[in-house]
Amino acid sequence: MTQSPTPAVVTVTGAAGSIGYAALFRIAAGAMLGPDTPIRLRLLEIPPAVSAAEGTAMELDDSAFPLLLDVEVHDDPKRGFDGTDVALLIGSRPRSKGMERGDLLAANGQIFTVQGRAINQVAADGVRVLVVGNPANTNALVAANNAPDVPAERFTALTRLDHNRAIAQLARHSGAAVRDISRVTIWGNHSSTQYPDIFHARVGDRSGADIAADREWLTGDFIPTVANRGSAIIEARGTSSAASAANAAIDHVHDWVLGTPEGDWTSVALPSTGAYGVPEGLVSSFPVRSVDGAWQVVEGLEIDDFSRKRIDASVADLESERDAVRGMGFI
């Protein structure tokens, strides 16, 4: 008789929202942690959204997923993160009309301070944290700084959506299949300052540098399309990306736990150790591989002046956000 794998406790904040709704059923089906890992789901919401989260929990029950052992709904972070192995921090304060950037950072600083402290106190020793709620990089920075007993590299922010968007645009432009594109990189912030880099990519039997030689397409089409794709989707749908964001979050954790494909890498925002001139501690996106369940930044990539300028601009954006939340006392 074979021994059953140890169940994974997965906590999803903002579970009643559209990204959470799009992610939860795929997580329960095994898309995130693989077909052999049983799941215990913890749905964490603010009190006004608990009823909606309970409705989602009912639907999860009704789906009778073989891997799903149980579902709990909480509004107390200490209960929601108790023993969690994987935390998807999707819930955040969205920017409302007329809201100043400082107000947005302050509102989210409070949320992610509380969540970081709760994770520090009650999560599993090997917890992995993915921040999806925007401003994701700085929210991850705040959470990590409020969880001093958790290794900083366990706190990451989502740039896999930007990474996937870049691959899709490159496929459309080149005629290559998505599966034949590798080694794309997103640098910097998950914002309009991000830099999607294809200079080291492989596109079928072509190099990304060869395709990037068309600078008019690169600077006038590719980079702005990827960087502003979220706004274009809001304009078209009337609401923000949900299914694609959920898919990217699942991709991110899947590769973190189970490994990146041989010969390829992905993009993850994580605390810098000083690589590529990014200030230490800043949560910035890098090219990474997952090795034995841990992210490792791909080293030794040549960065030309074209790329350096764009990386530096996005890093400056991150430094501005970091300085703002530091001034508010969140880090």
From Swiss-Prot:
Pfam families in the record: Ldh_1_C (PF02866), Ldh_1_N (PF00056)
Alphabetical list of PROSITE patterns matching this protein: MDH
EC number: 1.1.1.37
Keywords linked to the UniProt accession: NAD, Oxidoreductase, Tricarboxylic acid cycle
Listed CDD domains: MDH_chloroplast-like
GO molecular function, one term: L-malate dehydrogenase (NAD+) activity
InterPro entries (UniProt xref): L-lactate/malate_DH, Lactate/malate_DH_C, Lactate/malate_DH_N, Lactate_DH/Glyco_Ohase_4_C, Malate_DH_AS, Malate_DH_type2, NAD(P)-bd_dom_sf
Enzyme class label: oxidoreductase
Record field: catalytic activity: (S)-malate + NAD(+) = oxaloacetate + NADH + H(+)
GO biological process: malate metabolic process; tricarboxylic acid cycle
Residues that hold substrate according to the record: 95, 101, 134, 165
Coiled coil stretches, renumbered: none
Residues forming the catalytic site: 190
Residues noted as binding NAD(+) in the record, renumbered to the chain: 14-20, 108, 115, 132-134
Gene3D superfamilies: Lactate dehydrogenase/glycoside hydrolase, family 4, C-terminal (3.90.110.10), NAD(P)-binding Rossmann-like Domain (3.40.50.720)
Family named by the database record: Belongs to the LDH/MDH superfamily. MDH type 2 family.
Function: Catalyzes the reversible oxidation of malate to oxaloacetate.
Protein name in the entry: Malate dehydrogenase
Source organism phylogeny: Bacteria, Bacillati, Actinomycetota, Actinomycetes, Mycobacteriales
